[in-house]
Amino acid sequence: MEDKKRRLEELLQTPCYSIDFLPQPIPPAALSQFRTIQHHLLNSEKRQEIKNRIVNILLKLLCFFPACVLWDGWKEQSSPQLIEQAVDTVMENHSGSLYLLFWQEESLLVFEWDALSLSLYHPSQQLLNLAQTIARSEGFFLYQF
């Protein structure tokens, strides 16, 4: 477990890509308006639609890449129900994070409560290509921070 925690912390320091419902980062001049829109989306009926898209992205990626999941402790195998329940809990409680460590790819995917996106750290080229295709299939975009 210590190895996974250490690896997670190392990966958080590597190049990061965003799987986002927006096509590019928000410019500083538009942050206030974005926060208003983000608050609305996270606190309205739209939240369910966004949650479903995020869960779909995660589950599709898990079809191709095995991952250890950090949610209430490390899980070597994740179930679709665990992923959906974790994303739902994070969004409902407006707190928490879900981590997927793709150990064969040496990559990390993070979902945090205050984001309408996923953060993908140190993706292999294969993971990056597939993540982009999957993101598009769910109406999301992939770009590097």
Q: What label would you give each PLM region?
A:
Residues M1-S117, H122-F145:
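Structured alpha/beta or helical-core interaction and ligand-binding surfaces enriched in interleaved
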